[in-house]
């Protein structure tokens, strides 16, 4: 018996499941909500195929159900399906709301990462611009003085005028922030700031959770932030 090829990543496992169960899984486009307990159905149906283990199946399912396209598909009126595409009941409101929050948090994380990357790019561009704009000091040729003839009177040297050094302009003081050391001391509605690279965005505390603090930015977006990214 020939050895079956082994799937090495969760993406490869998802591609295999989409080919094996096309009425349930999809490799692209909006995904359909899965039946509750579908993991055990997968174990029963694909046990031994492609050398798949339970750990691989569980990791692939976690990646699949946390993807944006799957979360978009979890909406009011949508129907869960089993491995063969048979309907298994409509989604309840609690699952729809949970998926909506997951999608909002995922988008907020991506936006925060992009803002941090853009801030770093601006800093790098500003640093490069300062180096290019700095003028190089040209050396002036030293004036040649005629040699004094023998017997000629020695003229007193003219005193050099002392050049005043240009006043240095003090750089504006950076705004000092106090890090949040204990999130349990925060209160709902309290104003603070969220660090994103070198910038700090104003925010308001909405909720204190076990994973961090849910805050709302001035833009209206809400996200969960860990304590090390919060300052006063």
From Swiss-Prot:
<dbReference type="GO" id="GO:0033592">
    <property type="term" value="F:RNA strand annealing activity"/>
</dbReference>
<feature type="compositionally biased region" description="Basic and acidic residues">
    <location>
        <begin position="147"/>
        <end position="177"/>
    </location>
</feature>
<dbReference type="GO" id="GO:0010608">
    <property type="term" value="P:post-transcriptional regulation of gene expression"/>
</dbReference>
<dbReference type="InterPro" id="IPR036442">
    <property type="entry name" value="ProQ/FinO_sf"/>
</dbReference>
<dbReference type="Pfam" id="PF04352">
    <property type="entry name" value="ProQ"/>
</dbReference>
<keyword id="KW-0694">RNA-binding</keyword>
<comment type="similarity">
    <text>Belongs to the ProQ family.</text>
</comment>
<keyword id="KW-0963">Cytoplasm</keyword>
<protein>
    <recommendedName>
        <fullName>RNA chaperone ProQ</fullName>
    </recommendedName>
</protein>
<dbReference type="GO" id="GO:0005829">
    <property type="term" value="C:cytosol"/>
</dbReference>
<feature type="region of interest" description="Disordered">
    <location>
        <begin position="105"/>
        <end position="182"/>
    </location>
</feature>
<keyword id="KW-0143">Chaperone</keyword>
<dbReference type="Pfam" id="PF17516">
    <property type="entry name" value="ProQ_C"/>
</dbReference>
<dbReference type="InterPro" id="IPR035236">
    <property type="entry name" value="ProQ_C"/>
</dbReference>
<dbReference type="InterPro" id="IPR016103">
    <property type="entry name" value="ProQ/FinO"/>
</dbReference>
<dbReference type="GO" id="GO:0034057">
    <property type="term" value="F:RNA strand-exchange activity"/>
</dbReference>
<feature type="compositionally biased region" description="Basic and acidic residues">
    <location>
        <begin position="117"/>
        <end position="136"/>
    </location>
</feature>
<comment type="function">
    <text>RNA chaperone with significant RNA binding, RNA strand exchange and RNA duplexing activities. May regulate ProP activity through an RNA-based, post-transcriptional mechanism.</text>
</comment>
<dbReference type="InterPro" id="IPR023529">
    <property type="entry name" value="ProQ"/>
</dbReference>
<feature type="compositionally biased region" description="Basic residues">
    <location>
        <begin position="137"/>
        <end position="146"/>
    </location>
</feature>
